[in-house]
Curated annotation (Swiss-Prot):
NCBIfam families: PRK00951.1-2, PRK00951.2-1, PRK00951.2-4. Pfam families: IGPD (PF00475). This is Imidazoleglycerol-phosphate dehydratase. The keyword Cytoplasm applies. It comes from Staphylococcus saprophyticus subsp. saprophyticus (strain ATCC 15305 / DSM 20229 / NCIMB 8711 / NCTC 7292 / S-41). Gene3D superfamilies: Imidazole glycerol phosphate dehydratase, domain 1 (3.30.230.40). The keyword tRNA-binding does not apply. The gene is hisB.
Length: 192
């Protein structure tokens, strides 16, 4: 399945394609560190992403990072609504050398993010560490997921953020995988 959205505001202009196939991802956010994290996300989630983004990065990376999270969340919601079968729940622990991150995902239709991660430094290169939570909040709310992200052990800030992205990607992959009953895993029969 292939899903595409464009978003244009006074601050950003985005074109994003999300697919659950093996196409090559092409990520150009204008923010080097975010490109790196999203590349890792695609590898570990099994999803393909093509992003072309322009934003007011001369101000900072906030708007483009948050808007990419918004649009990716909307595309994930579109994908979830098209699927007739998925596991619903996913959990992943990822070590990255001295760091350890846990992500738990419920495709619930009830948007909630618990982000329990005190990152060691305020920046990785020029990227503000606080934007990691902003990205995930935008994605989770728009995808209507219940998600808990916990940084259990820290150290190097790059490693901390990388472990967070990888653990979320792996938990999402598990939650999106087909279930044995070929149905929506809810006693209500629907997830909205």
């Amino acid at each position: 399945m292939i899903f595409q959205k464009k978003r244009k505001t006074a601050e950003t202009e985005l074109s994003i394609i999300l697919a659950d196939d093996k196409r090559t991802s092409e990520i150009n956010t204008g923010v080097g560190f975010l490109n790196h994290m999203l590349t890792l996300f695609t590898f570990h989630s099994g999803l393909s992403i093509i992003i072309e983004a322009n934003g007011d990065t001369e101000v900072d990376d906030h708007h483009v990072t948050e808007d990419i999270g918004i649009v990716l969340g909307q595309l994930l919601l579109d994908m979830i609504r098209e699927r007739k079968s998925f596991q619903r729940y996913g959990v992943s622990y990822i070590p990255m050398d001295e760091t350890l991150s846990r992500a738990v995902v419920d495709i619930s239709g009830r948007p909630y993010l618990s982000f329990n991660a005190t990152l060691s430094k305020e920046k990785v290169g020029t990227f503000d560490s606080e934007l990691v939570e902003e990205f995930f909040r935008a994605l989770i709310i728009n995808a209507r997921l219940t998600t808990h992200i916990d940084l259990l052990r820290g150290g190097n800030t790059h490693h901390e953020i990388e472990a967070i992205f990888k653990s979320f990607a792996r938990a999402l992959k598990m939650a999106l995988s087909e279930n044995d009953n070929d149905n929506i895993p809810s006693s209500k029969g629907v997830i909205e």
